[in-house]
Amino acid sequence: MSDAPPQPENEQECMCTQDKVLQFLNKMADESGIKDLTDPALAEFLSDSDALKEIRDLFHYPKAGTLPDADPSLVDPESDSIYLCGNSLGLMPKATGEVMKDHLDKWAKMGVFGHMSGEVPWAHCDEYCLEGVGRLVGAKKEEVSVCNSLTVNIHVLLTSFYKPTETRHKILLESKAFPSDHYAIESQIRLKGRTVQDSMVCLEPREGEETLRTEDILDYIEKNGDEIAIVFFSGIQYYTGQLFDMRAITEAGHRKGCFVGFDLAHAFANVPLHLHWWDVDFACWCSYKYGCTGAGSIGGLFVHERFLNDQRERMLGWWSHKMSSRFVMDNVLDLDEGAAGYRISNPPIHTVAAMLGSLKVFDQVSLENLRSRSCYLTGYLEYLVKTLFGENSEQRTTKLSISIITPEEFHQRGCQLSLKFSSPIDIIYPELVKRGCAVDKRYPNVIRVAPVHLYNNYVDIRRFISVLQEVAHIVESE
């Protein structure tokens, strides 16, 4: 059994506030001699002064001219793009190409012998990721597996943990969960002989509010937990960017006898996680957003160590069988322990190679340091949006106004801010793209913007704001 991950030092992981960000900006403005906090020159100074600025050099950062819809008459093709879309797809680490090439060369030279030979034998390749992935989710090696894709892992885990009874059969999730989660839960309920109408509970925010209050989630579990089989929330809500209090939700669910699991698609490699210490029952994630492993790359799952030798029914395959006797092939299952027993098939080396390449970056910088950097990046973005586009701001120079639906409290958000526009985004979004911006649209009027702590900087954010000001005037004219 491996050692437990470090215990979190405090209950509220992020202690940053908007006041601290403002103090930081004013301090840096004084040092630079720049009085206006919205001055693009301050962004240059902030980026040059950033202790983690060289992490960006570990990534391939796209030029504006390589983006398919950028207009060369509006943006210099040789300039860096404004890539603020890592919440959808992270950028490629330079190490990834090298790792992939090594395994392609190995395939060419060894063929089938690559399964058991070489520096990273393919039959064991996922195991080489476990320590690094365990650090990112706050888990022991035995509690994590690198396998499948996110939705497949939702099915794998719910098949095993969702055992409805006549009195306890409901699954609680947030309203407007990501569609794949919603469909997976619907199908699991039907497969277990229940109806979605009776067994699926989607918790809505209060009227007039965009995000769920933690106290409302906990109150619902306390009042209705005896009927709930599983509480299954996102770690970070994909649309609003809200970071849920996973520790508090887990404690509330356990007090009422519920299993508690999380979809960490937008939390993995974004914010520090402590799944082991939070006592979470199970969780799963994709790795291609903040994990930077490439489109559709391999996912992962977590099962708490208390289920290490648990024999609950599950979806099985030959990779569920212990490696020590797997190739005896006598068709007598020798179930692997912990999360390894939830694997089904052999890992695809090319997507595992992408994970290995990404983990080389996280070997050089801690997620805790990245989290601190993230708070100041999003705080700077928030300041600029509120100052230059806030509905009641005296410095707003356009009729277009923008509000932020992501929570203001830093401990309730990660890298992403979801911007809500006073005008439909049908014109706004294409004009941003023409000018070399990569952001993410959600109709009718939300654009998700994610300054990723690994490779974005203050200049990227200020350039985005400048483009947004330009586009706002186009919207006014049309």
Curated annotation (Swiss-Prot):
Pyridoxal 5'-phosphate binds at residues 150-151, 178-181, 234, 263, 266, 288, 318, 346. Gene3D superfamilies: Aspartate Aminotransferase, domain 1 (3.90.1150.10), Type I PLP-dependent aspartate aminotransferase-like (Major domain) (3.40.640.10). Pathway: Amino-acid degradation; L-kynurenine degradation; L-alanine and anthranilate from L-kynurenine: step 1/1; Cofactor biosynthesis; NAD(+) biosynthesis; quinolinate from L-kynurenine: step 2/3. SUPFAM superfamilies: PLP-dependent transferases. It holds the Pfam family KYNU_C. Its EC number is 3.7.1.3. HAMAP family: Kynureninase (MF_01970). It comes from Caenorhabditis elegans. Belongs to the kynureninase family. It comes from the Eukaryota. One of its GO terms (molecular function) is pyridoxal phosphate binding. It is found in: Cytoplasm. The keyword Signal does not apply. This is Kynureninase.
